């Protein structure tokens, strides 16, 4: 049984238990209607199935925090079915099924340090750094003076993922991407 907290203490990226299943809080909203009791609406991702649901709690309720083992590891390689990570302290390797990573897999780079969440030794989640730097390997050429517009174009980055970038970004440029949303943050001069 995990630790219980008041629902008003909930934060983004917390791990909670709902109906006996582990969930990660993606977003939450404290709602105070004109009439009636205040409540908290929580958007959460099931760590085992990947399904995203919305849960409503009364503001007086408490929730159970999920009790997971968290290990910092480094991404090594993909074997076609699983992503392999190495524990930098022990040298242990862990295989994480592609279904556990979902869309985040497109932003994995060799050597990237991540957190792996384990439930009774089984990987149930991976947390990438909030942002990372990637090289643009394919995009339409930019033009001088294209900096004042908010128009975006597709660009393929070195992991193979396609992201939307401003018009002034060229092949070979290094860009910072938000790994949670896939959105362009800024051009990086290294």
Curated annotation (Swiss-Prot):
UniProt keyword annotation of Protein transport present: no
MF terms (GO), sorted A to Z: translation elongation factor activity
Record keywords, A-Z: Cytoplasm, Elongation factor, Protein biosynthesis
Chief location bin: cytoplasm
Top-level taxon of origin: Bacteria
Pathway terms, separated by semicolons: Protein biosynthesis; polypeptide chain elongation
UniProt subcellular location: Cytoplasm
GO BP of this protein: peptide biosynthetic process
GO cellular component, one term: cytoplasm
Gene3D superfamilies named in the record: 2.30.30.30, Nucleic acid-binding proteins
SUPFAM superfamilies to which the protein is assigned, alphabetical: Nucleic acid-binding proteins, Translation proteins SH3-like domain
Biological role: Involved in peptide bond synthesis. Stimulates efficient translation and peptide-bond synthesis on native or reconstituted 70S ribosomes in vitro. Probably functions indirectly by altering the affinity of the ribosome for aminoacyl-tRNA, thus increasing their reactivity as acceptors for peptidyl transferase.
Membership in a protein family: Belongs to the elongation factor P family.
Cited PANTHER family: ELONGATION FACTOR P, ELONGATION FACTOR P (EF-P) FAMILY PROTEIN
Protein name: Elongation factor P
Organism for this UniProt entry: Persephonella marina (strain DSM 14350 / EX-H1)
Upper classification of the organism: Bacteria, Pseudomonadati, Aquificota, Aquificia, Aquificales
């Amino acid at each position: 049984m995990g630790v219980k907290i008041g629902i008003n203490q909930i934060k983004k990226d917390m791990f909670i238990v709902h109906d006996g299943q582990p969930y990660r809080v993606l977003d939450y909203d404290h709602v105070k209607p004109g009439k009636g009791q205040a409540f908290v609406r929580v958007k959460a991702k099931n760590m085992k199935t990947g399904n995203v649901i919305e849960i409503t709690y009364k503001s007086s309720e408490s929730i159970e925090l999920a009790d997971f083992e968290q290990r910092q590891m480094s991404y090594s390689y993909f074997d076609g079915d699983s992503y392999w990570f190495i524990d930098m302290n022990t040298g242990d390797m862990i295989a994480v099924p592609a279904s556990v990573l979902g869309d985040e897999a497109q932003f994995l780079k060799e050597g990237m340090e991540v957190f792996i969440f384990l439930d009774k030794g089984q990987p149930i989640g991976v947390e990438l750094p909030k942002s990372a730097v990637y090289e643009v390997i394919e995009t339409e050429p930019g033009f001088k003076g294209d900096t004042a517009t908010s128009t975006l174009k597709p660009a393929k980055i070195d992991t193979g993922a396609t992201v939307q970038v401003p018009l002034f970004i060229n092949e070979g440029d290094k860009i910072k991407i938000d790994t949670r949303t896939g959105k362009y943050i800024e051009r990086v001069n290294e």
